């Protein structure tokens, strides 16, 4: 998939880049798989902002994605590759032999006309197929990995994401994530073969504020540009620094301070991700 550049007929247009849509099939989405999600724009049930820098963004419909991949024993044909406004990868429309249609994440290399299937074991190792981790060969690249059997894929779903199956130990398998983290996942969990497509997304330049507004992202004001009443970094004459380590508007350390709470799943992480 190619990166598009644009002629600079306005100053903001000069630095914008986008993705070519040549891989997208020119046909409407399946209406039964579209749903309107409520817009919260970072507000809670009282209307108060609980998550800053969010807004509604452009109008869009949510595509119902099959993350579980538990339609065993029935082959499906890729009918279309579509754009999904709620995620940065493409989605593939699968038409199964029993007449049902479902959307799945498009792995790299999957195109219109290909045949995909899901089963507990015994499938070819090719992009788009899904099996239980215990039956996938060591060394295979996977995505859309479950953390609890039957719950549906929760990990490795964004554009260009992947993990490699490194080994098997009793009821667990070992995955190496793109970040370098090594972690155990239950061998009964499902995973899809291949790397998530649209890997060029990481090279796209937003280019102007308006594109982020369309995505539902509002501007972020620096704490040092505020008054002392609004932020611990506020106040002072000119561009004076705050004189303290960086903190959030509520005084908690940020910019490098560890904030992750200990969780029960920590024991499944063999080695942490590598710092960049």
Swiss-Prot record:
Gene3D superfamilies: 2.30.30.30, Nucleic acid-binding proteins, Ribosomal protein L2, domain 3. Part of the 50S ribosomal subunit. Forms a bridge to the 30S subunit in the 70S ribosome. It comes from Campylobacter jejuni subsp. jejuni serotype O:23/36 (strain 81-176). Belongs to the universal ribosomal protein uL2 family. Residues 230-240 have a biased composition (Basic and acidic residues). This is Large ribosomal subunit protein uL2. Keywords: Ribonucleoprotein, Ribosomal protein, RNA-binding, rRNA-binding. Disulfide bonds: none annotated. Residues 255-276 have a biased composition (Basic residues). GO terms for cellular component: large ribosomal subunit. Pfam families: Ribosomal_L2, Ribosomal_L2_C. It comes from the Bacteria. InterPro entries: NA-bd_OB-fold (IPR012340), Rib_uL2_dom2 (IPR014722), Ribosomal_uL2 (IPR002171), Ribosomal_uL2_bac/org-type (IPR005880), Ribosomal_uL2_C (IPR022669), Ribosomal_uL2_CS (IPR022671), Ribosomal_uL2_dom3 (IPR014726), Ribosomal_uL2_RNA-bd_dom (IPR022666). GO terms for molecular function: rRNA binding; structural constituent of ribosome; transferase activity. One of the primary rRNA binding proteins. Required for association of the 30S and 50S subunits to form the 70S ribosome, for tRNA binding and peptide bond formation. It has been suggested to have peptidyltransferase activity; this is somewhat controversial. Makes several contacts with the 16S rRNA in the 70S ribosome.
């Amino acid at each position: 998939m190619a990166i598009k550049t644009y002629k600079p007929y306005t100053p903001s247009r000069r630095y914008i880049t986008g993705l070519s849509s040549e891989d997208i099939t020119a046909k409407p989405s399946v209406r039964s798989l579209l749903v309107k999600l409520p817009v919260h724009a970072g507000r809670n049930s009282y209307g108060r902002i609980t998550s800053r820098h969010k807004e509604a963004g452009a109008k869009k419909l949510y595509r119902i994605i099959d993350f579980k991949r538990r339609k065993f024993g029935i082959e499906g044909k890729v009918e279309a590759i579509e754009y999904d406004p709620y995620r940065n990868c493409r989605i593939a429309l699968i038409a199964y032999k029993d007449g049902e249609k479902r959307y799945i994440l498009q792995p790299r290399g999957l195109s219109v006309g290909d045949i995909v299937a899901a089963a507990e074991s015994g499938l070819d190792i090719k992009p788009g197929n899904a099996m239980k981790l215990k039956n996938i060969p060591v060394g295979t690249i996977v995505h859309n990995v479950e953390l609890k059997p039957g719950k549906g894929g929760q990990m490795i779903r964004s554009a260009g994401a992947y993990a490699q199956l490194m080994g098997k130990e009793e009821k667990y398998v070992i995955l190496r994530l793109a970040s370098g983290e090594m972690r155990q996942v239950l061998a009964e969990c499902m995973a899809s073969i291949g790397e998530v497509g649209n890997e060029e997304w990481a090279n796209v330049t937003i280019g102007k504020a308006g594109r982020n507004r369309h995505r539902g992202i509002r501007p972020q004001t620096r704490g040092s540009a505020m008054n002392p009443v609004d932020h611990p970094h506020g106040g002072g004459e000119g561009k004076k620094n705050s004189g303290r380590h960086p903190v959030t508007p509520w005084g908690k350390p940020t910019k490098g301070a560890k904030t992750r709470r200990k969780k029960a799943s920590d024991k499944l992480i063999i080695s942490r991700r590598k710092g960049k």
